[in-house]
Amino acid sequence: MAKKVAVIGAGVSGLISLKCCVDEGLEPTCFERTEDIGGVWRFKENVEDGRASIYQSVVTNTSKEMSCFSDFPMPEDFPNFLHNSKLLEYFRIFAKKFDLLKYIQFQTTVLSVRKCPDFSSSGQWKVVTQSNGKEQSAVFDAVMVCSGHHILPHIPLKSFPGMERFKGQYFHSRQYKHPDGFEGKRILVIGMGNSGSDIAVELSKNAAQVFISTRHGTWVMSRISEDGYPWDSVFHTRFRSMLRNVLPRTAVKWMIEQQMNRWFNHENYGLEPQNKYIMKEPVLNDDVPSRLLCGAIKVKSTVKELTETSAIFEDGTVEENIDVIIFATGYSFSFPFLEDSLVKVENNMVSLYKYIFPAHLDKSTLACIGLIQPLGSIFPTAELQARWVTRVFKGLCSLPSERTMMMDIIKRNEKRIDLFGESQSQTLQTNYVDYLDELALEIGAKPDFCSLLFKDPKLAVRLYFGPCNSYQYRLVGPGQWEGARNAIFTQKQRILKPLKTRALKDSSNFSVSFLLKILGLLAVVVAFFCQLQWS
């Protein structure tokens, strides 16, 4: 008999967990508290309690080729960076293709997940749910928690003396939907992550003035990288990841600083991070520097105090007549349906083996999917997590001892603090390519480069120097997909397809730039031999 698995949430992590369960012959049931799939990526005009919320203009920060699921490329005519509605369309196509909706119970809230009395031998869980006011319970062999970590708004009001005196409007960025109603106002955005920057840029087009307060500064990157390709298809390669791992930390930090300042000098714009040697996640925004140049946005330091109508900053400057304050100060998370002893959240941190498994359980039948912030796309990350977890549930992969897992958790946390710092917003941060490879190794899906160099050198070179996308993890091992190799070699075609909307005459393959390179090489050779002749 197939093992029954409860999947909590039908967002990105929940959908891919359903598919992985089906792929492994498990019997999943997904509980989704709302009426539809999509999680945080499904825009709604009104904020709902217990549900993630986005603003209407949200666009992905990771490109389609680096974000799609490993055996299901996005349509080639989809733009490279997707509006939330377009991404939701992809999820709907995905769910329909793999017939996932039949496993989902919508408008069903999970009230509790408790160990069964014989858990030490069975590993089973009693799950209590509520739908239309009626409670039900069922026993499952395993549970996948896919409820996300962008639900509880973090508003540190006590950190802002005088907040109680402020007479203007204030709210968390979670409540922001669109710029209507903010025309002509003087607005202060506190926090300069991706959401804070997006909101500041959008409001600055019609507001009287927008100020953005950043405590430590930040790097700002464009979505557009070398030769106009998406940033992550250039940044996330195995070769670059190797360099970041083997070079001295100072050299890596210097390289990152040079790369970030290539677009614009952050020091001149008042944005340079206070501690440049901490690997803080950069802000992805194509408009911030231009809005700063136009004066529509002004960067400010930390807010020291608020009065009835003004903000006083740590550097002594004061901005008067503030109408609105928006707190883009991130989120905290919790699991109210779980006992604290199962997944304990302290200071926005959880102690999970590889960000997935509680280490102390007698049976490894509870897993958290998507409770992580990789320096890359969450979608392939959650997929590899789910692929590994379902194989653990099935007994095809095993976990080490509790002691070994706890040592790994401690070591990983120390490394995270060393790389990313101790900020509450960085508690789930991890390197991207390294983590994907780590999970793939557990599954048996990591490509063997030494073997490929002899069997398929063209593919080996592409895997090492090209974009590290999800298709690579379908080349070998469990879940192997025969279309993976072709998907890797045709990704450039899918990147360029939505851009080629104007017909151009075919240009000669023997381009002027190529000719200049040949002439330059010949000039170097001639100069070398001339030097030998005269020496």
Curated annotation (Swiss-Prot):
Subcellular localization: Microsome membrane; Endoplasmic reticulum membrane
Family to which this protein belongs: Belongs to the FMO family.
Assigned keywords, A-Z: Acetylation, Endoplasmic reticulum, FAD, Flavoprotein, Isopeptide bond, Magnesium, Membrane, Microsome, Monooxygenase, NADP, Oxidoreductase, Transmembrane, Transmembrane helix, Ubl conjugation
Protein residues bound to NADP(+): T60, N61, S195, G196, S197, D198
Bilayer disposition of the protein: Single-pass membrane protein
Transmembrane segments: 510-530
Statement: the UniProt record of this protein carries the keyword Membrane: yes
Entry-annotated residues carrying N-acetylalanine: A2
SUPFAM superfamilies recorded: FAD/NAD(P)-binding domain
Gene: FMO2
Cross-link Glycyl lysine isopeptide (Lys-Gly) (interchain with G-Cter in SUMO) mapped to chain: K492
Residues the record lists as binding FAD: G9, A10, G11, V12, S13, E32, V40, W41, N61, T62
Name of the featured protein: Flavin-containing monooxygenase 2
Species annotation: Homo sapiens
Cofactor(s) the record lists: FAD; Mg(2+)
Tissues in which the UniProt entry reports expression: Expressed in lung (at protein level). Expressed predominantly in lung, and at a much lesser extent in kidney. Also expressed in fetal lung, but not in liver, kidney and brain.
Lineage: Eukaryota, Metazoa, Chordata, Craniata, Vertebrata
Stated role: Catalyzes the oxidative metabolism of numerous xenobiotics, including mainly therapeutic drugs and insecticides that contain a soft nucleophile, most commonly nitrogen and sulfur and participates to their bioactivation. Specifically catalyzes S-oxygenation of sulfur derived compounds such as thioureas-derived compounds, thioetherorganophosphates to their sulfenic acid. In vitro, catalyzes S-oxygenation of the second-line antitubercular drugs thiacetazone (TAZ) and ethionamide (ETA), forming a sulfinic acid and a carbodiimide via a postulated sulfenic acid intermediate.
Enzyme class, UniProt record, top EC level: oxidoreductase
